[in-house]
């Protein structure tokens, strides 16, 4: 169960990172 929870957290972190990168790229273009 802990392993599944860790995997889920990692996936969420990856999604947050991709969103953050997208946001940074947009702000850089301005």
Swiss-Prot record:
Keyword Disulfide bond listed: yes
Domain of life: Eukaryota
Tissue-specificity statement: Extracted from castor bean.
Keyword Disulfide bond in record: yes
One Gene Ontology molecular-function label: nutrient reservoir activity
Function recorded in the entry: This is a 2S seed storage protein. Inhibits spore germination in R.solani and F.oxysporum. Exhibits anti-trypsin activity.
Family assignment from sequence similarity: Belongs to the 2S seed storage albumins family.
Subunit structure: The mature protein is a heterodimer of a small and a large chain linked by 2 disulfide bonds.
Protein name from the UniProt record: 2S seed storage-like protein
Originating species: Ricinus communis (Castor bean)
